[in-house]
Amino acid sequence: MKKFWKTTLAVAMTACMAVSLAACGGGSASSSSDSTAAASQSGAAADGAIKIGGSGPLTGPAAVYGNAVKVAAEMAVEEINAKGGVQFALQFEDDKHDAEEAATAYGTLKDGGMQISLATVTSAPGAAVSPLYQEDQTFAITPSGSSPSVIYADGEGMTGAYGNVFQMCFSDPNQGSGSATYIAAHPDLGSKIAVIYKNDDPYSKGIFDTFKTQAAADGLEIVYEGTFKGDESDFNVQLSDAKAKGADLLFLPIYYTPASQILTQADKMGYKPTFFGVDGMDGILGVEGFDTSLAEGVYLLTPFVANAEDEQTKTFVENYKARANGEVPNQFAADAYDCVYALAQACEAAGVTADMSNADICAAMVEQFTSMTFNGLTGSDMTWNENGEVTKAPKAMLIQNGEYVPAAE
């Protein structure tokens, strides 16, 4: 099993470096006009700071993700600026997990002089604005936009890489295949698998598709596949069908709000399988009105465990909690923190300065990210390929006594 977690998880693609550099060629298309009333500006940087922009859901049902990214990114910017080397100024906008809102946020960030981007927090908005990063020759790295459509023009076929949009998070295909292989290596979790996924969401469907393929390769038995769309909140039919099929493990490649509803409704009907999710379920313990005792024993695949004992994680968690009213950081926060530090490492190595054009900064960032190794909260010896996919090992996390703890490898 340990050998699996050490293998390369990024998909090997054939696009060449020329494509990446082409995405950053020419002059800057970013506006240098002054920004007014930004949703969030942080950094306390000196004059000459490199302007970083980003957007995510700060309001609405996915706000736990966006606010975690915002807090962690602000924290990283302030720490980096205090060191006196490369200086950043951060502007972060609310996109409400909506593609049109994300496009509006992009325009605001561009008008504010954005030179490098943290892209978007969630996948659907990311897929909508990634072509704009390529068009404007602005380098972007998303902490958590995991769909292939965020970094590929053809997300389903995983072709046509933008070349200048990178991911810090696992891609959806890797989450699906990684989950299946972990479950296969731990047969005590369950032998008959049911899946409930959101079939109008590229994130959810993308994970399911690769989970199903890998499950077949690993000899897992999927006895039921249930779907839902939009804002559906009644899952009694799907749960009843899964229970009738004898499923003793329920795989949920979905976000935390519907996951909390599924756990609640399963409990009411006396259905108690092992629940297994991915990064979108990180945050379920913070759902308002949810009985968190129902999440006891839930498994998640994630790159970050807040209860890890290494000093870097402990310091990050302590500082984050001090800024976030005692809230424990999720993996979205950790990925965002890593994004900012990876950008700082790349900027320092490339000698990037604020007076450079977006295109020149973009080319320098692509060159650095495709050649450097980065150590962060969410992985050691991380690397990126020319398509923007990251290579790092996932970890399984278990909810125990109301806390996230490392699960067996």
Regions flagged by a language model, labelled:
Residues 1-11:
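Bacterial N-terminal signal peptides that target proteins for export
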Residues 19-23:
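C-terminal motif of bacterial Sec signal peptides marking the signal peptidase cleavage site
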Residues 10-18:
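Hydrophobic helical h-region of N-terminal Sec-dependent signal peptides
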Residues 7, 25-29, 34-409:
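Extracytosolic ligand-binding ectodomains
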